[in-house]
Regions:
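Conserved glycine-rich cofactor-binding loop
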Residues: 11-12
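C-terminal helical subdomain
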Residues: 174, 189-225
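Conserved NAD(P)H cofactor-binding loop of Rossmann-fold oxidoreductase domains
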Residues: 80-88
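Residue(s) in the substrate-gating loop at a strand-loop-helix junction
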Residues: 132
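Rossmann-fold cofactor-recognition segment
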Residues: 46-61
């Protein structure tokens, strides 16, 4: 039986690795991102399985472009959102903060809503998104990043409840990885418990196939987050949570 997936943010990093795993598993995959050259490389590698669409999540028409891609493919069983940005910003540069909100907040909402609307009209599907463990607590070194990741966590939870209220056959998987060695992390800092992108992608796909509601990747971060959640605000605000220089 033909299975169709669309991966938003498939040009690099986790999105590309997940797209490759889906392709190896026999899926028809719509790959979407801003970089046409990287997407074309995937199409050349898998000409019978890949459909390309150049989409920028910050474009006001990006939702309509996603719907058009789904229709061009003949359906969308899985929408996988791997598009996002993040920077440490201890000086609270407003340009960085607003750019992060535009991509991780507005762009995320635009694409998830489009996928939700499409699946609601076409009998259901599965929405999976890479968020982050950073959404667990406010991180002083990356204010807008941690705030937008918390927004993503709650937004997916709210849509999952809405889908059940409306009796829609839509599943959700909120994927919360820790630090992964991708271009999203700059080379100027040392990141603790850094994870390999290929290994992380395999763990993510395992969670997607199992249709887990929330997947913290990997076990070390599950332990860390369990501890973070127990730290009261009066103590948390004094903790110097940051990467090493």
């Amino acid at each position: 039986m033909r299975k169709n997936a669309i991966v938003m943010g498939a040009s690099s990093g986790m999105g590309r690795e997940v797209a490759l795993l889906l392709l190896a598993d026999g899926w028809q995959v719509g790959v979407a991102a801003r970089r046409a050259d990287a997407l074309e490389q995937l199409r050349k590698q898998y000409p019978e399985q890949v459909t390309v669409a150049v989409i920028d999540v910050t474009d006001e028409t990006a939702g309509e472009q996603l719907t058009a891609l789904a229709e061009r493919m003949g359906g969308m069983d899985l929408y996988f959102h791997a598009s996002g940005i993040g920077k440490q910003n201890p000086n609270v540069d407003a340009e960085i903060e607003l750019l992060t909100v535009g991509t991780n907040g507005m762009g995320f909402t635009r694409m998830i809503d489009a996928a939700f609307g499409y699946m609601a009209k076409h009998g259901g599907g599965h929405i999976a998104a890479i968020t982050s463990v950073a959404g667990t607590k406010g991180l002083g070194m990356a204010p807008s990043y941690s705030a937008t990741k918390a927004f993503q966590n709650i937004y997916l939870q709210a849509l999952e409840q809405l889908a059940n209220m409306r009796k829609l056959n839509i599943s959700f998987t909120d994927i919360r990885p820790g630090f992964v060695a991708t271009a999203l992390l700059d080379d100027e800092h040392h990141y603790p418990m850094l994870m390999n992108v290929q290994t992380t992608a395999r763990l993510i796909m395992k969670a997607v196939k199992a249709k887990k509601h929330v997947a913290i990747v990997d076990w070390r971060y599950r332990v860390l987050i369990a501890l973070w959640r127990r730290v009261p605000r009066c103590i948390w605000r004094h903790l110097p949570i940051k990467t090493k220089d």
